[in-house]
């Protein structure tokens, strides 16, 4: 697997400072794990974002979502939008495996709640997806509960990117896409906060691919000469997951994650008809206890004008995360013989 990230090519996105790993896991407590299925017919998997180590159902996280273009099948967003809370890990997989992964998260959380003596009669798993059928026999639905458990068990801070987990079969801007991540740190009132982004990139058309103002897609098309013309439409979807330790409300968090679209546009996406562009975000502070014993819960939130730095940071992190998903992915040959090249050979 190619481990070179965008920064390893001497390319820097923006000017804001990154976290130590420049990944979503720079937010304290957040870990990420993958399970991958790779054989002659399948390039697919599941990626799980673990927001914390403790029981999320017992102490829910403030969360929000925003759908830029709704050509997608993500599960769990209705309740996230209504209540502003997240109560399970976030899983990413392929489109037709959403149901099986959803069921696996229910089982995993039911076991956790039973072990912690926490009553659970209903739960809202969040599962995002991209259609990886260009490289994966998607109707086979090869991802099962064991893969979800494998991804959770593998969750760590310094996780792999590229064609792994939920990114094993994705195609981004006509090249091999995958999982990518980045982070930015901001200072407010003398305290440092982190915003991290993880993407599952499966969107865009080659012609529009832009790397820090360089029209790389057009260069690639020119170098290919007589090769077949690339797919002209921006379709296929991208999942964007934001984590932060900022003290914000779910409404403020929604304002922040909307700015992921800025980073996406900087890479050349115009959010086409067939692209499901979905953003999910959570903060690790302002937790909400489950049950009806607490009538009043005190929380701290930033003033609105303070969010300006967060808007800028999330745009930079998303842009870099998309480019890292491309840089870290190796070329893959589809079952029908089509080759989806790695961007690394053109940088």
Regions found by a protein language model. Give the residues of each.
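Alpha/propeptide regions of enzymes that mature by internal proteolysis
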Residues: 1-347
């Amino acid at each position: 697997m190619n481990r070179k990230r965008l920064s390893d090519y001497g390319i820097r996105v923006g000017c804001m400072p990154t976290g130590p790993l420049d990944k979503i896991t720079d937010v304290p407590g957040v870990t990420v794990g993958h399970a991958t299925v790779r054989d002659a017919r399948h390039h697919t998997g599941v990626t799980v974002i673990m927001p914390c180590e403790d029981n999320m159902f017992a102490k829910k996280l403030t969360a929000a979502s925003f759908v830029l273009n709704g050509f997608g099948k993500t599960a769990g967003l209705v309740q996230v939008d209504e209540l502003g809370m997240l109560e399970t890990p976030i899983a990413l997989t392929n489109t037709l495996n959403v149901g099986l992964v959803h069921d696996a998260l229910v089982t995993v959380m039911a076991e956790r709640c039973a072990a912690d003596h926490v009553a659970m009669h209903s739960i809202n798993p969040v599962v995002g997806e991209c259609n990886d059928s260009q490289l994966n026999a998607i109707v086979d639905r090869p991802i099962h509960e064991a893969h979800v458990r494998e991804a959770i068990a593998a969750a760590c801070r310094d996780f792999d990117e590229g064609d792994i987990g939920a990114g094993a079969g994705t195609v981004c801007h006509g090249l091999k896409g995958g999982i990518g991540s980045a982070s930015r740190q901001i200072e407010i009132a003398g305290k440092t906060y982190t915003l991290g982004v993880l993407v599952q990139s499966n969107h865009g058309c080659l012609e529009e691919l832009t790397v820090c103002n360089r029209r790389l897609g057009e260069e690639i098309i020119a170098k290919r000469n007589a090769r077949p013309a690339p797919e002209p439409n921006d379709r296929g979807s991208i999942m964007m997951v934001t984590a932060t330790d900022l003290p914000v409300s779910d409404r403020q968090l929604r304002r922040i994650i909307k700015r992921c679209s800025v980073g996406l546009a900087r890479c050349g996406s115009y959010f086409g008809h067939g692209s499901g562009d979905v953003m999910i975000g959570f903060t690790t502070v302002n937790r909400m206890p489950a049950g009806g014993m607490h009538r009043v819960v005190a929380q701290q939130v930033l003033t609105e004008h303070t969010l300006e730095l967060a808007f800028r940071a999330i745009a930079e992190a998303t842009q870099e995360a998309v480019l890292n998903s491309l840089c870290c992915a190796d070329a893959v040959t589809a079952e029908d013989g089509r080759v989806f090249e790695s961007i690394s050979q053109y940088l």
